[in-house]
Amino acid sequence: IEEIPRSFQEKGDVVYDGRNVLKRIGLGSIDVVVKSFKKPHIINRVVYSFFRQSKAERSYIYSMEIQQHGFDTPEPVAMIEQFQSGLLSHSYYICCYDGGETVRSLMDGKVEGNEDKLSAFARYTAALHQAGILHLDYSPGNILIHQNDANEYSFSLVDVNRMQLLSDIDC
């Protein structure tokens, strides 16, 4: 894990390359996903260094919170922050690889044939909100779906650095 900042560019398979870069990397006997967050601009470098948790740290903490509430998210492994001249320069979030597919296919407008999946997704979404978990980037690419041998569906949240935990009063 300590080698990730030095070897990130050369190792692993790119899963996503946009504002941030996600790579699947083998670490011993497990595969992990490493999310390299874009280098923040100077104002956010100051903010993340002194006033607010970095996106990597929030991802790690929120993943544990989600699990404590009884919901799935890929198992958090670590987060890494690098500082240059006392300011955050790069950060990485590492979690176990989850082979689930995103729910994008459910959002294509086709209800017929997807009734069971859509019902399960609606129940899952309601349960998240009842538990006070508000994912502020609840887009189809950030929700993974799994189907077990009994044809039951479960879901897993990813990209959780923008999340809010509500109190019972707020729910």
Task: Give the residues covered by each predicted segment.
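Active-site-proximal flexible loops/turns
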Residues: 42, 82-85, 103, 144-149, ...
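AlphaC helix of the protein kinase catalytic domain
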Residues: 103-112
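Short alpha-helical scaffold element within the canonical Hanks-type protein kinase domain
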Residues: 114-118
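Short alpha-helix boundary/capping segments
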Residues: 51-54, 113, 170-171
